[in-house]
Amino acid sequence: MRFDAIVVGSGMSGGWVAKELCERGLKVLMLERGPNIEHGPDYSHELAGRLRKRDDQVPLEERQLHYPYYEGVAYALFNSNKKFWASDHDYPYETVPGKPYRWIRGYHLGGRSLTWARQSYRWAPDDFESNLKDGHGVDWPIRYEDLEPWYDHVEAFAGVSGDYDGLPQLPDGDFLPPFPFNDVEQAAKAQIEAAFPTRHLIMGRTANLSRITKAQMDVGRQRCEQYVRCHHGCPLGSYFSSLAATLPAARATGNLTVITDAIVESVTYDAAAGRATGVRAVDRLTKQGVTYEARLVFLNASAINTAALLLNSRSDAFPRGLANGSDQVGRNLMDHVSCGPVIGTYPGFEDTPYQADRPTGLYMPRYANVTETGKPYLRGFGFQGGAARRRRPDAEPDASGAPKRAWVFSLTPFGEVLPNPDNRVTLTTSRVDSWGVPLPVIDAAHGPNEHAMMREAARDAAAMLSAAGCTDITPWEEAGAKLTPPGDRIHEMGTARMGRDPATSVFNGWGQAHEVANLFASDGAVMASSASMNPSLTYMALSARTANHAADLLEQGAL
């Protein structure tokens, strides 16, 4: 069967592309390299509820072999849900000596949309103009106004809870009611904002349903019950994922075909026609090759895999990889950067109960080089954090005989990483995986801007906790020197950027390849910069916009 469109990848962006195309009447084939996951029955949510976390840890030897990136996702990777985390042993990649990279993946239907932290922020107008203003990277070919209606579109369907905060550096959206602050957070917010009036501590905006709408009920989703076992999959569909939301909507049209265990290794290309004709894939289980054909091809395999697919799709017409006349495929790999968390003990509130059942923390939007200028670095960062109780074994026991728990407040910065063409993905010429596909080689490191930014972020965090009255605050010099390695924040992007000029970019502002008109992408690969906010909501908006534009072109006979 020949399809109207092939979508490679079933995660955050691929699910949106499939939904939009199917609802426009296109026959869509979705290819997922990993196994099928059934929404609900294949989740570990109920099992995790019966286990103590300490009894659900991946054994040390297994962790060292399969999950060496564990440190960055220790909050979410457990023995009961390890199938949602790709094994570095089974799916290897290479790095450059002295430049570690943590590539954290989810190879199964739904991808990392099952395990993401659900933080959902619109980028600001300035984020689409920063490259132009300071000369790093290339200018975005779109502006916030181009994406604004698509932010509206995806928020209404996905469901994002949050406050209307009225901050230009973090645009408001179509929100469900926010989750509440606890008493300590309310007190700390007042103290911090009084001491630093240019900074704002807000409730995190999260893709958890604090209230149900018809759009969500129509695909079988339910209101969030705040079990806080989201990383095990939610059988209620209370947080947004491909399995809970976009794929049910796509399937409801009757236009979607899903094939799992299909490892796409390259895009096929007809040089005479100047068009992509489909993809070549390898069956994960049988290792047999198969070719699928379609009028349109969408790459939504995640930034590194999308770049690897293009690089491996070489031909006489494109000896450096498909659509790579600019030599930009694989370049400008970005993530976000954090330093060590800054934590302080918050006094008082000893009799205030703590319920660890909120599916989001607090957020402080960027202020550096926005409301506070003259910084010794470009761009900026936001903070994620909140207040919780921590066990104090040295304290007097409470009435039940259990050790008292002190309130602690933590802040962790997430900083923007500048585009750098030397941070890149290539393919090894000497090693292939179990399916005969060349391994990606990742060469990336943080630069002086990221180091300077994190040093100040740690100092700022300590100053804010001090203003809130905290004691025993993490030494900021210590925290600011501990940068997360690239990849650790799980926001990889930028390997096939969109831009205005085919000489310096791979895709145009619609996610359409400059050199191959029926080839599209809308995952992290197309990002021209990284901003300071989590990128998933922007991936969703770009995907909906790209898919509808492609459908328009097909209807007009332009493809």
Predicted regions: what they are:
Residues 23, 27, 34-54, 236, ...:
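Glycine-rich loop(s) and the adjacent beta-strand/alpha-helix scaffold that form part
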Residues 202-210, 227-230, 259, 265-268, ...:
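A glycine-rich dinucleotide-binding beta-alpha-beta segment and adjacent secondary-structure elements
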Residues 529-547:
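A conserved FAD-binding loop/helix module that cradles the flavin
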Residues 5-30:
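N-terminal Rossmann-like FAD-binding beta1-loop-alpha1 element of flavoenzymes
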Residues 39-42, 161-173, 471-482, 556-559:
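Short, glycine/acidic-rich hinge or "gate" loops at secondary-structure transitions
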Residues 7, 11-12, 183, 304, ...:
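Residue-level detector of alpha-helix initiation sites
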Residues 54-87, 91-102, 107-108, 116-122, ...:
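Conserved redox-cofactor binding core of oxidoreductases
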Residues 82-112, 116-117, 122, 135, ...:
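FAD cofactor-binding and catalytic pocket of flavoenzymes
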